[in-house]
């Protein structure tokens, strides 16, 4: 047995420990075929850069689950991996190249992809280093990457199979276009923001010049693609105009007036311009009326040759130029400023352009129905908290076909080939013969990520051991922000291709926010690097904070004050452990367990030993129950209370009555209970704090704590009588301590304590444990009886089953106390005067921030409460004096 260092130093505790775990292969599945499998696939982080605090939270929760299940005897697999993150990673690499004055087009596809692979290797190494510092118990022998050949094979098979079923198709439709990244986006990759904009009202003159029709748009630059104006066929103002033409301003070409219910007579003038290549609703109108589709924009957001004099302009520059020209021609009626919702690319931040484009799509109706129906079966996915099941179903009910092609180079190239005759070949391998060219587009990143739970297990080979044993996986841990992006897609793809749910449970957590509740972001500059936190506090402190503040579905606020509290708690555990082990006298864990069994059988020990074992039992039961419900925050509070309050503050202190005695036999029992309880605490904490618990465990046991048994409830430890008795004992001691504090009497001053109880069992219990009462209350005189009469002037405390009297004459000198209270009253009056003066200052109230004013008001209320309480104490003292 070695000795813990005098001071807890997380850097020393954690240094080299992770590599020792890896060298010992303790993170791999046990391979025990009799053990029940439990598997988790890590949500693969993007290889775009370093991991943030949200990743640290997400992976900490997974590690807690897998470490506990490993200790409980499950055959555990936690499979790690990373995502190629097509658009995000490509954007990062292009940004790096731009700094060197190079574009991807300068390099060409192959050389550019070489650069991206270099980036991937660089950041994959960084991510794995971060995982190590976090202590994640993943099995690196099964590490996967979404562009691995095995996963690529699965992607190709899924694409081909869905294509053959008619559920993947290629067509020209309005899609969300990112002009910065020059690629299509799915609906959920578009973030809508309220921005200041305008409705531009303009007149389109009838061909005969008899009148003008007024239309309005937020995007006047698209008018060069107008092919009609629409009115409602039932609108009496315009129904006679259907079939006639208007003159498109600037362009001076004739476009027809069509009757279509898309035009709402109640909205605006009831006339809408129709631009089928640049608006999804207009596209539908165009389809119904067989209108041409005129695309007036290049893929980089500049205007093309169909915009005439405005060709080559950026779309926003063209907007202003178009408006100026309309005004010059007298066609601009007015500009109506307003705030409206505008779609932005989730990745590049660019304003998204609705644009006609030929893309590949997944037909979603059957896949969505299958996923929704499955939630009514035993094969369903259970969401924690359950409300997210409704979120999932609501999205599936309203889902649109999924655009899966991306105009990128980094990703899974679409397995479709074209020849000069216009034929399309879709297959897992390239077609035989010459003259075929593969589609240059790649698949949406989420297409491959949707296959992650089963492609990582070897699918489409369903005979491999990992797929048969560990799929479906047990639990997925992820944030609520990607339920639509990822969770939903994994569910419907897994059901379609394996017939099983991808995971049995989904634990949904929230977002990490700053101390003020704001989302962490680069723009706010409030992001926190988890590695900086680990360097200062250690990984265990960060993990404790992340788990202890965690409730399913809820956000968590980060603060350094909370990190200080986390470190302090671990330091407390360290100091308790050091105290116990220094007083252990060579006792082994096996000997301690044998002696504890005697305590449970009432063959040795005392009531406080029985009490702590009973409470340990309850703690194990409650922590295990809350872990099973993924209520890690609740479990953390239970552990904290047991360790700090019941074990450290009470039991460890109570044991000094024995350890400082001459009774060697009792000392052995007490040391045994201390070591046994410490061991169970360390095991309970290990899933959350792996480093410090391994260090403590190594002081009294052989091997690694990673694979030892998790604590279980022992019925023999249940002892309600001991629990009840010691709780009353604690109540008595607390009551005396509180009374001393209330009248400012030092703990060192002996006092008279009278305990009156009509409960004979409680009287016997207090009497037989009088040494504990004396040790904690320092009485000059202690009397316990049912016949005690209440003194006339005494501090009285009532606890369950007893009344406690502390005669005031023994407690204080009334004259000295009155003098002290007068000084205290003057202090509170001074504080009240100062804060009252500040709040009475009109300039201060007018100029100070609301939160500053509220802070002063809170101080005023606090000082007033203290002033009033002091006045009450003075009145009590004067009553005693008289």
Swiss-Prot record:
Catalyzes the attachment of valine to tRNA(Val). As ValRS can inadvertently accommodate and process structurally similar amino acids such as threonine, to avoid such errors, it has a 'posttransfer' editing activity that hydrolyzes mischarged Thr-tRNA(Val) in a tRNA-dependent manner. It catalyses: tRNA(Val) + L-valine + ATP = L-valyl-tRNA(Val) + AMP + diphosphate. GO terms for biological process: valyl-tRNA aminoacylation. It is found in: Cytoplasm. This is Valine--tRNA ligase. A motif ('HIGH' region) lies at residues 45-55. Residues 808-882 form a coiled coil. ValRS has two distinct active sites: one for aminoacylation and one for editing. The misactivated threonine is translocated from the active site to the editing site. The C-terminal coiled-coil domain is crucial for aminoacylation activity. Belongs to the class-I aminoacyl-tRNA synthetase family. ValS type 1 subfamily. NCBIfam families: PRK05729.1, valS.
């Amino acid at each position: 047995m070695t000795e813990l260092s005098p001071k807890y130093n997380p850097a020393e505790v954690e240094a080299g420990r992770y590599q020792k775990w890896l060298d010992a292969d303790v993170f791999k599945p046990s391979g025990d075929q009799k053990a029940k499998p439990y598997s988790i696939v890590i949500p693969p982080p993007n290889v775009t850069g370093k991991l943030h605090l949200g990743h640290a939270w997400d992976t900490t929760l997974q590690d807690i689950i897998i470490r506990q299940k490993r200790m409980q005897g499950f055959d555990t697999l936690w499979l790690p991996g990373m995502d190629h993150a097509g658009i995000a990673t490509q954007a990062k690499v292009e940004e790096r190249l731009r700094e060197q004055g190079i574009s991807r087009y300068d390099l060409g596809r192959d050389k550019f992809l070489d650069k991206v692979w270099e980036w991937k290797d660089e950041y994959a190494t960084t991510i794995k280093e971060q995982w190590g510092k976090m202590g994640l118990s993943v099995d690196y022998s099964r590490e996967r990457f979404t562009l691995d050949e095995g996963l690529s094979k699965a992607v190709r098979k899924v694409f081909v199979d869905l294509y053959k079923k008619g559920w993947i198709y290629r067509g020209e439709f309005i899609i969300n276009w990112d002009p910065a990244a020059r690629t299509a986006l799915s609906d959920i990759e578009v973030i809508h923001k309220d921005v200041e904009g305008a409705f531009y009202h303009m007149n389109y003159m009838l061909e005969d010049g008899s009148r003008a029709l007024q239309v309005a748009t937020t995007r006047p630059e698209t008018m060069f693609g107008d092919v009609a104006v629409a009115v409602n066929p039932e609108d009496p103002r315009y129904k006679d105009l259907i079939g006639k033409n208007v003159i498109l301003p600037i362009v001076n070409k004739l476009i027809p007036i069509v009757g279509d219910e898309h035009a709402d007579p109640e909205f605006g003038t009831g006339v809408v311009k129709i631009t089928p290549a640049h608006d999804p609703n207009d596209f539908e109108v165009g389809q119904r009326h067989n209108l041409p589709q005129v695309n007036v924009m290049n893929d980089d957001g500049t205007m093309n040759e169909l915009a005439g004099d405005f060709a080559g302009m950026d779309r926003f520059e063209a907007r202003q130029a178009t408006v100026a020209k309309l005004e010059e021609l007298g066609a601009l009626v007015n500009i109506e400023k307003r705030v409206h919702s505008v779609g932005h690319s989730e990745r590049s931040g660019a304003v998204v352009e609705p644009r006609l484009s030929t893309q590949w799509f997944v037909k979603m109706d059957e896949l969505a129905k299958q996923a929704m129906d499955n939630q009514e079966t035993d094969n369903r996915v259970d969401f924690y908290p359950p409300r997210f099941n409704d979120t999932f179903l609501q999205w599936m009910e309203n889902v649109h076909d999924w655009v899966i092609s991306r105009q990128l180079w980094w990703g899974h190239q679409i397995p479709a080939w074209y020849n000069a005759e216009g034929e399309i070949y879709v297959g897992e391998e390239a077609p035989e013969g010459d003259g075929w060219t593969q589609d240059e587009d790649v698949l949406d990143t989420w297409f491959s990520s949707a296959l992650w739970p089963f492609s990582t297990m070897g699918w489409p080979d369903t005979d491999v051991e990992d797929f048969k044993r560990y799929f479906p996986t047990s639990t997925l841990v992820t944030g609520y922000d990607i339920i639509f992006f990822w969770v939903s897609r994994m569910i419907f793809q897994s059901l379609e291709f394996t017939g099983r749910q991808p995971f049995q449970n989904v634990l949904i957590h929230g977002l990490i926010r700053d101390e003020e509740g704001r989302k962490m972001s680069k723009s706010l500059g409030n992001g926190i690097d988890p590695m900086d936190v680990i360097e200062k506090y250690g990984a265990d402190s960060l993990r404790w904070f992340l788990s202890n503040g965690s409730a399913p579905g809820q956000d968590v606020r980060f603060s350094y004050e909370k990190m200080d509290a986390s470190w302090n708690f671990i330091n407390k555990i360290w100091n308790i452990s050091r105290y116990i082990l220094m007083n252990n006298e060579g006792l082994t864990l096996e000997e301690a367990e044998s002696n504890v069994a005697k305590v449970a059988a009432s063959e040795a020990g005392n009531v406080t030993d029985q009490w702590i074992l009973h409470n340990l039992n309850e703690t194990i039961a409650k922590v295990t129950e809350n872990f099973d419900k993924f209520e890690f925050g609740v479990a953390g509070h239970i552990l904290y209370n047991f360790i700090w309050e019941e074990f450290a503050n009470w039991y460890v202190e109570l044991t000094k009555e024995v350890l400082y005695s001459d009774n060697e036999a009792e000392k052995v029992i007490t040391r045994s209970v201390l070591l046994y309880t410490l061991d169970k605490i360390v095991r309970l904490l290990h899933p959350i704090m792996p480093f410090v618990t391994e260090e403590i465990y190594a002081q009294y046991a052989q091997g690694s704590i990673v694979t030892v048994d998790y604590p279980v409830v022992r019925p023999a430890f249940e002892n309600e009588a001991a629990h009840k008795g010691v709780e009353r004992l604690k109540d008595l001691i607390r009551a005396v301590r509180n009374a001393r504090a209330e009248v400012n009497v030092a703990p060192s001053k002996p006092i008279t304590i009278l305990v009156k109880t009509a409960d004979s069992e409680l009287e016997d219990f207090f009497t037989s444990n009088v040494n504990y009462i004396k040790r904690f209350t320092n009485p000059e005189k202690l009397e316990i009886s049912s016949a005690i009469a209440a003194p006339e002037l005494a501090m009285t405390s009532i606890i369950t089953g007893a009344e406690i009297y502390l005669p005031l004459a023994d407690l204080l000198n009334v004259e000295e106390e009155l003098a002290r209270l007068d000084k205290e009253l003057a202090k509170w009056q001074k504080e009240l005067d100062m804060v009252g003066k500040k709040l009475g200052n009109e300039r201060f109230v007018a100029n100070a921030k609301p939160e500053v004013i509220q802070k002063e008001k809170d101080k005023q209320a606090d000082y007033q409460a203290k002033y009033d309480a002091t006045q009450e104490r003075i009145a009590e003292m004067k009553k005693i004096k008289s």
